[in-house]
Amino acid sequence: MNSEFSLAYGNVDSDYALDLLERLDSNWKGTELFTHIRETFQIGLGNVIIVSEQSESLRIPPSLLGSSSPADSDNSPPGTPTNEAQPWFISEDLSKGPFTEAQSTQSSIETLEGEHHAVSSLHLKLNGLSCIGRAVWRATRKMDTRTEVDDILNSITEPRRLTLPGINKMRQCIVRLLLLVPIQVREEILSFAIASGIPSETIEDIRSSTNISAVDTNGRGIAHNSKKRSLAPTQDSRNLRRRIRGHTQ
């Protein structure tokens, strides 16, 4: 394969991007491909697919993207670490668009009456929700609320079909996740999502659902009913804010 590569990518959260780089570092370190990715890869750009000048494509093995599916194990480089169970929107490979299969499913298209703009809108919305979901999932891994986070994630039905009920189910679960993290962290995650290109209407929809309209100078959330919610920072929230700021600068 030619040494010149180009990258195509979708939006992912910064922690996920760093995790991917670490796995590439441990498995493909020293290879020409890794060197190029290391020089090109930026925080927030993920779901990598590498395309050579000859239009040959080299997909990053799904196991390196976080999938724990047994079907992916044969494609993994030696020494690939075993990953903990992850929700589908963490491990799903969105590098070619989230709905490659669903677009060819007649029932899915009929659900939206074949309207292309509606399909595109749902693509953006689910991709945006997935990005926020990944950010929250990564952010809460070491927090006391992780058991509750896992319970919520286990209730998510994979919306692989292009249906509004599936999208709404995903949105409801993301809202529940965001309510588990400190207000300051919640706003930082939403701000990062906006910077990642998620449609502003999706962000505003979620922000209104979490009943937060602003954050005052003391870091307290101001709810829509104008009652202030006090929040005593915990060590978890301090560490989390520091980590998010470091990854998104």
From Swiss-Prot:
It comes from Zygosaccharomyces bailii. One of its GO terms (biological process) is plasmid partitioning. Residues 67-77 have a biased composition (Low complexity). Keywords: Plasmid, Plasmid partition. Plasmid partition require REP1, REP2, and a cis-acting DNA sequence (known as STB). Residues 240-249 have a biased composition (Basic residues). The lineage of its organism: Eukaryota, Fungi, Dikarya, Ascomycota, Saccharomycotina. This is Trans-acting factor C. Residues 61-86, 217-249 are annotated as: Disordered.
